[in-house]
Structure formats: structure tokens, C-alpha cells
Amino acid sequence: MFQDKGWILVTLITLVTPSWAAYKLQERYSWNQLDFAFPNTRLKDQALASGDYIPQNALPVGVEHFGNRLFVTVPRWRDGIPATLTYINMDRSLTGSPELIPYPDWRSNTAGDCANSITTAYRIKVDECGRLWVLDTGTVGIGNTTTNPCPYAVNVFDLTTDTRIRRYELPGVDTNPNTFIANIAVDIGKNCDDAYAYFADELGYGLIAYSWELNKSWRFSAHSYFFPDPLRGDFNVAGINFQWGEEGIFGMSLSPIRSDGYRTLYFSPLASHRQFAVSTRILRDETRTEDSYHDFVALDERGPNSHTTSRVMSDDGIELFNLIDQNAVGCWHSSMPYSPQFHGIVDRDDVGLVFPADVKIDENKNVWVLSDRMPVFLLSDLDYSDTNFRIYTAPLATLIENTVCDLRNNAYGPPNTVSIPKQAVLPMGPPLYTKQYRPLLPQKPQTSWASSPPPPSRTYLPANSGNVVSSISVSTNSVGPAGVEVPKAYIFNQHNGINYETSGPHLFPTHQPAQPGVQDGGLKTYVNARQSGWWHHQHQG
């Protein structure tokens, strides 16, 4: 009967449900407390005795993957942190609790040696040219204990030679007495020299752009979108209620290149449930720092309990972000409107994902998530007989499967009526330019996940303040009952004349060069006890 009327019955269940175990992300590494790869036991014992190494003071906050190395950052918030920029040799340590190896070496992790070392690193980024971007905050301590032995400095390493190829100190005009920068986004244009980095000043309320080619930076400050929302400063994580009401612009992600040759930068203040956006055409232009207010776009709120500190977007426009209040990782497909019904949860774990501090997507479209129980570390006491820090991984396709972010999911578009591409692609046309990047990394063997058991049937639409939505009839036509438009990606694109260009056509008009006379416009156990199909196939076969 429903088919005759052209309707599909879709059951939507609120996220206000009991906690569940994560089924998609798989634990790769875990620690009760961090350990470092000292040159020998004698030096390690000396560091322990002197207080240069205090294991209980080390908290990992950032993760990034490249080749056979998994980078982990450990800020010097407390005494006894022997190295801030480290990595795991994944050839030697497939799983377990490996020692962290200082990168590129021990000497380069000396606190206070401003010109030659990194004092404190937070989140880092590997670009498609094989370079590791690290912002040294130059700080030791946190909050009222903070000292600044060194200035903020951009450090870039060549990962093929493991040498630093650039150090750039941020000038005083780009910071202020309240500056705290913990996030970075890297924008590569037509070649490796056409590179920009963007830094979010969380407590100084600004956005700093740096040009690799010009070796110069500038600051955007005159925007209220960088500030916290006074109604969103209350947090609840791991049973701890606390207020981070001063936390401004924090997490950032970059879209794929749009048809006008620029990307879209998405960002959120930490004390906020809302996302904002701006074209990198604006950020790349030093002359626009004071007159670009109306070039920034405010998007909708994500919904309740949706504070986020980290976000990343794939090259086909799928954004992943941590949901620190929900012990979860969320998703949004950027070809869809930024509204709660188009946000999904790819995984949740009320033990393993307590404060998923960082989320990354690597060159092979594998996702990496680091969780660290940060509020417990800062505001209470960690139990060092328990597992406190974890790094998870899964293929991106596995994570978004059966969520609203998977546009191939028939629940969000009827079969045999509209051909939905497997991935959102930019409109076809003559190339804007030819990228001149480094040679491609050797690709990992392609693994078929066809034999993997499907995850439990779950829905991922955000909770609506306790209201349960169920048994909604969705029309295969563009307009449903009572003239309500159906929330489907293909219908949204049809109504708005969008030709599947990700992240921006519904936000920014395609930029054209200026013309004369024309205004420019729960519960998770270890991997070997979980053995999801794809993990078992990849590592046991």
C-alpha cells in the first residue's frame, strides 16, 4: 500500500538511548600511562629520579598518521614531560602500548631551546606534500601556571628526510596576551609552494593565516564568530560537570577545492554548538583582515550536547568531528544542509571514547581517533591501573556506512529513480591547474570488506531534547505530506541547482575575477576480543 502511494517507511530513533559499545572503531593502541623510548634504561632511571620524567603527568592530545609512523603530541602542561612531539613505529608495534619515540630526535624536544627545539605541540597536520606542520606554542604549564619561554613558531618538517625545513615565528601583532592556539589546518593549492596554514586562537579570539610562499602571516580578529556562545559554556564529561565558558574558535576543517579554486574553512568555538564557514579566498588575502565580516557565514546548530574540539574533512566532503559530551564521533556530508537531521554519529563508547580529543583522516582514507579522558586528568584524578589513553582506527567507508552521511544509503534516496554517485565530486570541466606534489605514497593493499558482518542496525539522527521521532513516512517525491520538503541529499541538490560540488555551493557563490564596473561580489574491550571482520581480515589474514 505504501509503495503504491510512493512512500517509504523510515524509522528514526532518538539518540537519547542507553550507552552502547562501539562497533566500528577498533582499538589499535592503549596505555594506562605513557612511556617514552629513552636511549637506555640508565637514562630513563635518571629522568625518573630527577623529575624530568613523571609518567602520570603526560597526556596525549594530538594524533596524525603518515606511512609507517603514527605521530602523537604530549603538551608540557605539567613537569616531567621528556618530549612533546613523538611517534610510534607501526612496523615494530602493530598494537599494544608502545613507547613514544621523540621526533625527529631527543634534542629537538628540549623545552626552552627556542630556535632548535619544540617546547609544546598540540594538534599537528601532515600535508599532501609529505610535510609535517607543527605549531610550537612555546609554553610550559596550563592556565594560571603557564609560562612562555619561547614565542609561537610554525615548524615544518620534511618527512622523507626527517629534517626541519622551515621555522617561522609569529610576529607580536598576530597574537595578544590571551592567545592560546591548539589547532591547525593546512591548505594546499596548485602546488606545494601554494600552501597556507590557519591557526585558531581559542582564548585570544582570532584566526591567523600563514603563507608558505610569502613566509608571512596575518590575523583576522574583527569577528564575533570567533567568540564563545555565552549559553554554551556548560560541559558534562565522564560524570564531571565543568564550565569552559571562555573557549572561542577551536576546531577547524577544510573542504575539497571548489570550482573557483578555493576551499571552505569550517570552524567552531569550543563553547558553542554552531559551525561557521569562510572561503579561503578571503583568508588568503591579507588586505581582507578588517573588512571581511560579511564574508563569514553562520550555519545552524548541531543540536544539544554537541561541543567539539576537533574536526577533519575528507577529499570527498565528509566531515568527521568529536562530540566530547557524548563520548562519540559525529559526521556530516558537506553537500547537505548543515542542520541536525543531516548529522550522524559514526561511533560511540562510554568508556573508550571519553573525550575523543583528536580525529584525523589519513592518505588512505583511514580514520584515526585519540581519546584521553582530558577533563578527568585536568579536574580530577586518573586511575593509572586502568586504560586511560586509546588510539582507534577504521576505514572511513566503514564508519559512515548506514549513517545519514553515506549518500549511497537507500534510506536517504529511493533506488532506481536518481543516480547518486558513490562520492561527491566537483563539476567536470577544464582543470584549474596541475598539482605538482610529491610522488604518491605506496598504496596499502586494497582489502575487501564484503565478508565483514554488518554493524548492528542503528540510527544516528541527533536527539531533539528528549523528543522521540518514529515511523516517519518519507515520500519518494520532492515534497512530502503537507508540503514538507523531504530531507534527502538528491532533493536538496535538485532544489538548489547544485551539481554535487562539495562544501560550499550552498554557502558561497562561485568566485569570478573582478571586472571593471562590477562589484566584487560503551563498552569496548581490546581488539583481540572484539575482532571485527575488517580488522581480523587486515591483521590476522
Swiss-Prot record:
Gene3D superfamilies with a match to the protein in the record: TolB, C-terminal domain (2.120.10.30)
Keyword Glycoprotein annotated: yes
A GO term from the CC aspect: cell hair
Major place of residence: secreted
Cellular compartments annotated: Secreted
Residues that carry a glycan: N144, N215
Segments of this protein annotated with the region Disordered: 443-463
GO biological process, one term: male courtship behavior, veined wing extension
Signal peptide annotation: 1-21
Keywords, alphabetical: Glycoprotein, Secreted, Signal
PANTHER family, per database record: PROTEIN YELLOW (PTHR10009:SF14), PROTEIN YELLOW-RELATED (PTHR10009)
Family from the record: Belongs to the major royal jelly protein family.
Function: Controls the pigmentation pattern of the adult cuticle and larval mouth parts.
Name used for this protein in its record: Protein yellow
The organism of origin for this protein: Drosophila simulans (Fruit fly)
